[in-house]
Amino acid sequence: MEKLKNELQAELTQNIMPFWLNKMVDHRHGGFLGRIDGHGNPVPDAEKGAVLNARILWAFAAAYRVLGKPEYLEAATRAKDYFMAHFIDPQEGGVFWNLDAQGRPLDTKKQTYALGFAIYGLSEYARATGDEVALQQAKDLYADIERYAFDSLNNGYVEALTRNWQPIADMRLSDKDENGSRTMNTHLHILEPYTNLYRVWRTPQLAERIANLIDIFLTRLLNPQTNHLDLFFDDRWQGRRNIQSFGHDIEAVWLLHEAALELNDPNVLQRVEHAIKAIAKAADEGLQADGSMVYERWTDTGKMDTQRQWWVMCECVIGHIDLYQHFGDTAALDIARRCWHYTRKHIVDHEQGEWFWGCDENARPNLVDDKAGFWKCPYHNARMCLEVMERGPHPQPLSKGRGE
């Protein structure tokens, strides 16, 4: 475990963060560039996405909190200032979905997922620095989500709304998604920032919202027949249940566990720990003999998407490290190590820095998709490094063993 921690600290400090510090700062228009293509070429006129910028903020704030490097604080503050000046909607509240390169709003819809990541970044900045303005903005965005996006009739959070919080026809997060009004992905990335906000703002209402989100996962999103998390639903939680996303499954394992541990409610923790062991076992259906984890499977056709995407590798490492740390699962530690070794060999770009989007089943790197961009951010890989760095070298069981 110590060797893994040292390797990941070196990866973070010598490869990932220097790339974003040295190549992604937008010296002309402020903030950060919107895109570097798969070959490493900057695209100076690229749009700037809310998710990318919130994740940059989170990554540098978290890295500063853990390592205390002044250059990380400077970058985090740059990201925070730009986000609050340009992405926050001063008239209607919430967060713009994207901006042009000059910082002017393009798509003004309110995607709940983007508000979640804004809370994640701002709350981490407040956690790292004690900044009250960032914390207040995070609280305001939390209030926006609860006021406009929460459906008290059917429970759960709507996927997207117009700028002034009215229903919108196309709610999709990306063109790869189904147009469902409820998605597992958005609920996961509301649970995640709410947990982080709770670390710096411990209110009973927020605790209740986190507990409710956990319940949604265990009663609505978890498929009791497969133990995978289903992805797309309508307002009444009806869905096709035809896609199994191994990366989201293993990411949810540790984020659900983190939320339950932070709440510190024994009953909630017991329910979560029972569920995440089953979800982790289902996620491991995506593991390959080479140590990697593939992307997803369509159950109606049996087809497997065998891409090895960067973010899936990261979540595979964290999820299995969590199983090792809390349940003493040495097999999970071995899975995490092997996944990192595959990633280091085939997905880390040792020449130009950062990571490729991924590679195919023959380990050929994906040069078509971005090196940095709307969805390719220093979030999954920086967080993988930080999560392993912050965890102890030996198992620290906080609860009953995995075999219960």
Residue ranges and their predicted role:
Residues 1-393:
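Glycan-recognition and catalytic cores of secretory/periplasmic carbohydrate-active enzymes
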Residues 392-404:
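Intrinsic disorder/low-complexity segments
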